[in-house]
Amino acid sequence: MTTLGTPLSPSATRVLLLGSGELGKEVAIELQRFGVEVIAADRYANAPAMQVAHRSHVLDMLDPAALRVLIASERPHVIVPEIEAIHTETLVALEREQGQKVIPAARAARLTMDREGIRRLAAETLGLPTSPYRFVDTAADYREAIAAVGLPCVVKPVMSSSGKGQSTLRSEADIDAAWEYAQTGGRAGAGRCIVEGFIDFDYEITLLTVRHAGGTSYCDPIGHWQQDGDYRESWQPQPMSAAALRRSQEIAKAITDDLGGWGLFGVELFVKGDEVWFSEVSPRPHDTGLVTLVSQELSEFALHARAILGLPVGAEDGGVIGQSGPSASCALLAHGNGVPVFDNVADALRDPDTALRLFGKPRVDGHRRVGVTLARADSIDAAREKARVAAAALGIQLTA
């Protein structure tokens, strides 16, 4: 797709975002830089990407009939799934029946919508190294799986994100509460879970991998720290051995080649010395990749947009995307109930080479990531500290 039209005209190039969170918002902005007409959809009104789209729709994207009605009415040239909670079988059917273009491909969206499809592909079809695992449907199966993989272990709903429904079990005392949380915290309600054994790793990375018209290219590895299964900080580049980096790229290429299509993939990996294990992959920008807003010449969102549109990404097949030096991000979390209001913004931006993104999420109920601070420095440690200081300076209030 190297010919682009004018938005809101008969020549418009229309892209439908299924999911309108903060990652979708940045993708929408990058698409609009190329004059793309952006339509944003999500299950709630005024989602972040809706605030920068040409128009928006609120619907249950797990409802196949509602999804078909939306796609028929908007007639998008390209559909870009931005979350897992989509009836992906509808996308598969539309791709097959009508040639509907889905990014990166409808099969990739279906396989990665839950942990089972992608884990079985990686471990059982491609033979990639992973943690030991079992899939379970009942409390009895769950207890058998724990006995098989051993403690400590992790339990996650097969369909969830941002740590929802996820628990780490360190003793038998954790077993019942973890099962209950897994049955209530997933995106699709009670149901199937994965029980994963622990890997003794040194660190974990996200290797952003972009499949584009010119081949496959890689970003420098992103290190990250998670709490309760959710991203808190990320930094780039993560130091690692040449052998581990080479193996990481080999694993990323194997999984993304099988999924196919064009777009950016977030490949999550565990690393110990020169050894690498596959963890997960998302066929879209990754929350840990928010650091690329300041760390790269082209952010993960710009890369995704360019790949979607068939445009050059600034790196050759097998090459590495340009990087600007040690950089870090720190997530901003709000706790409570209400509409976020931010103060001390000037203080948060006082240090040079510090940036801030406020996502525009319309409401917080419980806890929610509402923004991110970003920083560059002479070292990873210094960049992380600058991002933390900026985050601590910002005040977050919730109003009725």
Curated annotation (Swiss-Prot):
Q: Does the entry feature the keyword Plastid, yes or no?
A: no
The pathway where this protein functions is: Purine metabolism; IMP biosynthesis via de novo pathway; N(2)-formyl-N(1)-(5-phospho-D-ribosyl)glycinamide from N(1)-(5-phospho-D-ribosyl)glycinamide (formate route): step 1/1
Q: Which PROSITE patterns does this one have?
A: ATP_GRASP
Q: Which reaction does it catalyse?
A: N(1)-(5-phospho-beta-D-ribosyl)glycinamide + formate + ATP = N(2)-formyl-N(1)-(5-phospho-beta-D-ribosyl)glycinamide + ADP + phosphate + H(+)
Which residues are recorded as binding N(1)-(5-phospho-beta-D-ribosyl)glycinamide? Answer: E22, L23, E82, D287, K361, R368, R369
- List residues binding Mg(2+): E268, E280
The EC number on file is: 6.3.1.21
Gene3D superfamilies given for it?
3.40.50.20, ATP-grasp fold, A domain (3.30.1490.20), ATP-grasp fold, B domain (3.30.470.20)
Any one GO cellular component localisation term in the record: cytosol
InterPro entries xrefs:
ATP-grasp (IPR011761), ATP-grasp_carboxylate-amine (IPR003135), ATP_grasp_subdomain_1 (IPR013815), PreATP-grasp_dom_sf (IPR016185), PurT (IPR005862), PurT/PurK_preATP-grasp (IPR054350), PurT_C (IPR048740), Rudment_hybrid_motif (IPR011054)
Superkingdom in the source lineage: Bacteria
- Extract one GO BP annotation from the record: 'de novo' IMP biosynthetic process
- Positions annotated to bind ATP: R115, K156, S161, S162, G163, K164, G165, Q166, E196, G197, F198, I199, E204
Example of a GO MF term: magnesium ion binding
- Which key words are in the record? ATP-binding, Ligase, Magnesium, Metal-binding, Nucleotide-binding, Purine biosynthesis
Report the top EC class in one word.
ligase
The ATP-grasp domain, residue ranges: 120-309
Pfam families assigned to the protein according to its UniProt record, in alphabetical order: ATP-grasp, PurT_C, RS_preATP-grasp-like
Family according to the record: Belongs to the PurK/PurT family.
Q: How does it assemble?
A: Homodimer.
Q: What does this protein do?
A: Involved in the de novo purine biosynthesis. Catalyzes the transfer of formate to 5-phospho-ribosyl-glycinamide (GAR), producing 5-phospho-ribosyl-N-formylglycinamide (FGAR). Formate is provided by PurU via hydrolysis of 10-formyl-tetrahydrofolate.
Q: Which NCBIfam families match?
A: PRK09288.1 (NF006766), purT (TIGR01142)
Q: What is this protein called?
A: Formate-dependent phosphoribosylglycinamide formyltransferase
Q: Which organism is it from?
A: Xanthomonas oryzae pv. oryzae (strain PXO99A)
Lineage summary: Bacteria, Pseudomonadati, Pseudomonadota, Gammaproteobacteria, Lysobacterales
